[in-house]
Structure formats: structure tokens, C-alpha cells
């Protein structure tokens, strides 16, 4: 395998924006794993945003322990590219929330209709580590990035 730190952040953003779903993982209060599929959008700063109800396990887990992991891609036959994403989650407020909602609504035009749901919240993940893997190549391209590497 070929490991590198020389991926173009714009290329990584393009890959992430070509996907709408991610498997999101969090840690339950009793230290057990919990995973769910979420629809997400991504900012130019590699922040992932998704909505959920505050009563969901993922919301409760992330309020208790903000460490989050997501896997994106790898589900399309013939396309063996994936991103593993680790970060810290929060519930943005104020101007940050408004900015991220606009990004989310651009990806999900039905998002504003859900905004009126009782208990709907928005979760933001800020990256701490990202691994892009392209197994379509031989040898595979594996790129690991830290938050400081992710400037678009």
C-alpha cells in the first residue's frame, strides 16, 4: 500500500460532496458502540453537519461523549474509495448554526421543512483525523490527514 500525506484537500472535498450518506458511530454511556446512517453535508472547513432528533441514541451519546467517527463511500459497485473520519461533535449555535444550516439545506432542500419538528437538533463534527482510501488503484492510495492538513 502507498501511504501519503499529499492529497489535495479540494479533491477530498469533491469526493465527500459526491456522497449524501455516512455511517456515523458514537459511544453509548455504558461504553458500547452505536452506529446509524445519517444524511450529511460538508463545509469548506471539512465540518460535517447533520440533523437528528434530540431523543435519538446518537444525540444522547454525543452529548455524553463528543467523539464521533463516520465512514463515507465504499458502497457503490466498482468504486472502492472510502473516507474514515474522526472528530469532535457539538451542537452549533448562533451564526455558526445559521451558516451550517445553509450548507445543509443546499444539500437537502427538504431540510427547512424538518426544522419545525419538535426536538430537531443539528450536530457538527470537526475533524481530528481523516483517512482517504482508493482501492481502485494498484497499489491502493491511502492518505491520512490531521485537522491541520485540511485547508481547502
Task: Locate each region found by the language model.
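Short, basic/aromatic recognition patches
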Residues: 2-22
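A generic "binding-loop/recognition-motif" signal
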Residues: 54-55, 128
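Charged, gly/pro-rich active-site loop segments
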Residues: 2-7, 79-152
Amino acid at each position: 500500500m502507498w501511504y501519503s500525506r499529499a492529497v489535495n484537500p479540494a479533491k477530498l472535498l469533491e469526493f465527500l460532496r459526491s456522497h449524501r450518506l455516512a455511517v456515523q458511530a458514537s459511544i453509548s454511556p455504558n461504553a458500547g458502540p452505536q452506529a446509524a446512517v445519517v444524511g450529511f453535508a460538508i463545509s469548506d472547513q471539512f465540518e460535517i453537519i447533520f440533523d437528528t432528533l434530540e431523543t435519538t441514541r446518537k444525540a444522547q451519546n454525543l452529548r455524553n461523549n463528543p467523539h464521533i467517527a463516520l465512514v463515507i463511500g465504499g458502497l457503490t459497485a466498482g468504486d472502492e474509495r472510502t473516507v474514515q473520519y474522526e472528530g469532535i461533535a457539538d451542537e452549533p449555535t448562533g451564526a455558526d448554526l445559521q451558516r451550517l444550516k445553509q450548507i445543509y439545506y443546499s444539500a437537502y432542500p427538504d431540510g427547512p421543512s424538518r426544522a419545525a419538528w419538535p426536538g430537531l437538533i443539528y450536530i457538527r463534527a470537526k475533524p481530528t483525523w481523516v483517512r482517504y482510501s482508493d482501492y481502485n488503484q494498484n497499489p491502493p492510495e491511502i492518505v491520512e490527514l490531521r485537522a491541520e492538513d485540511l485547508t481547502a
